[in-house]
Amino acid sequence: MSDTGALHESWATLWEAIADAQPDALAVVIGTQEMTWREYDDRAARLAGAFTAAGVGRGTKVAQLMFNCPEYMESVYAAFKVQASPVNVNYRYQAAEIAYVCDNAGAEVLVFHGAHADRVATARADGLMPSVRLLLQVDDGHSLIDGARWYHDVIAEAEPAPRIDRSGDDELLLYTGGTTGMPKGVIWPHHELFGALAFPGYMAAGLDVPTTIDAVAGTAAAIRGSGHSPVMLCAPPLMHGTALFLAMSAFVMGGTVVLLGGRSFDADELWDLVERYQVTQISLVGDAFARPMTAALAARAEAGSPRNLASLQRIASTGATLSADQKRALAAHAPNLMILDMIGASEGGPFGVSATMPGDEPTDTAVFTAPPNVVTLDPDTHEVIPRGSDTPGMLAVSGPMPAGYLGDPDKTARTFPVIDGVRYTVPGDFATIATDGTVTLLGRGSVCINSGGEKIYPEEVEVAAREHPDVIDAIAVGVPHERFGQTVTLVCSTRAPVDPDAIIDTVKERIAHYKAPRQIVFVDEVYRAPNGKLDYRWATDTAIAALAGS
């Protein structure tokens, strides 16, 4: 991957250049609500003015506890304007968890929807968020809690903050949702994040990465002039890096970010927005999003009113792969569609890309192509494993990356090691890389199953199981076994009753027999986090409880 770190600027400065160049273009759409770049910049500037008046500035942490909404992006932009660091907080967290993130980050500002007000009030009453001194509540029909101010009143009363000189070393703090341990704050300097997002933005569009602010604005103007400005629909929550980062990538190219208006995923609303705003790209996370989307497309087609998806050029799935049947179903309704599976992490990437072009037959979704700066490392020695080796190693990528984890130098040293003078990001996924760059993803080392001394990576079992036509979703875990230490157990949901042996046979047809599940636990729905990622702790608990009762 080419060096994309030459532009050493704040994201606020970049977005201001875009706003000046195209003030009347659409910046944000949520449901039927529209906001131009002029409005977006003005509202963010007024909130930044309120921040400045409250003593919020460089390095201050500004936490967001919100559903997808314009206020989310406004508060991120406003924080950037005053050189503060946005902090994402999972809106499903309970009071103690909200307090943990705010306290761990040292957040001084919390912007939140009224729907979360009771939990915020509980955390405050219990003295769990001592650093938070400014509460801004977004009005959604709930009463204002003690000590908070209405978000929109603050903006209406504030004067726009003047534009200032900023630094590419300003930071965004992204908390990982992970499936093990407490959330960790990943520190992303602005210039490093710009470099990392060059791949899904400029490079994916075949464009040179700008190296000056004028070039950023000029590139956006050229894209708009050609009629190809990106219109990015972010289906996952902005509280996760997948949606937020791709929204930022679309913004810096002068594009429009489209968000669903509802608070639960509605596939029909998504397709309405695609048609209404001529959406060009959709960001999602695996089959958890794709299955209701394809079901909605099929229902419309069967009713005699198929969707017009001529504008849709790309669907990108990060964090979970799309199954072959879902790729086929999407491609059947969108003639110009390119489908991308990307291996990424809060700590960086991409580590691999799987592209299904228009007319291609979808293949095994666990096979990707690694960019040149991606290697595998021996987990014990940290030596680079030559491409073409069958030895599994930890995926690692060099190039733009975070500064580390907030307040955790030991984990920073483990995840971002320097090897032979090169700094790598090593989030913990195991894989092999063939001579031609083909990546076979094996899964995360922390959830690797050890059965009789054999290492079994869940993802290869899950991908194989989903090839059974009646399997909707599946997650593989290891359950304790007296003789083998662990045995592979599959927790899965199906469209109809299925003989467990049929699923096991499907797996054995695709991978080594010893990797196949010894038992299967059927559930109505395989639980996934709001970002679409599988929850291995939930699956392990579910499997153990079901097997104990059988």
Task: Show where each model-derived region lies.
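Conserved AMP-binding/adenylate-forming core of the ANL superfamily
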Residues: 3, 7, 24-69, 73, ...
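Conserved AMP-binding A3 loop
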Residues: 36-38, 171-212
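Structural core segment of the AMP-binding/adenylate-forming
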Residues: 53-54, 84-156, 165, 496
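Adenylate-forming
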Residues: 67, 112-121, 141, 236, ...
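AMP-binding/adenylate-forming catalytic core of the ANL superfamily
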Residues: 93, 99, 110-113, 393, ...
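Conserved pre-ATP/AMP-binding loop-to-beta segment of ANL
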Residues: 157-177, 181-182, 221-231
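Conserved AMP-binding/adenylation subdomain of ANL enzymes
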Residues: 195-235, 239-283
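Conserved AMP-binding/adenylate-forming
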Residues: 255, 313-439, 444-448, 461-462
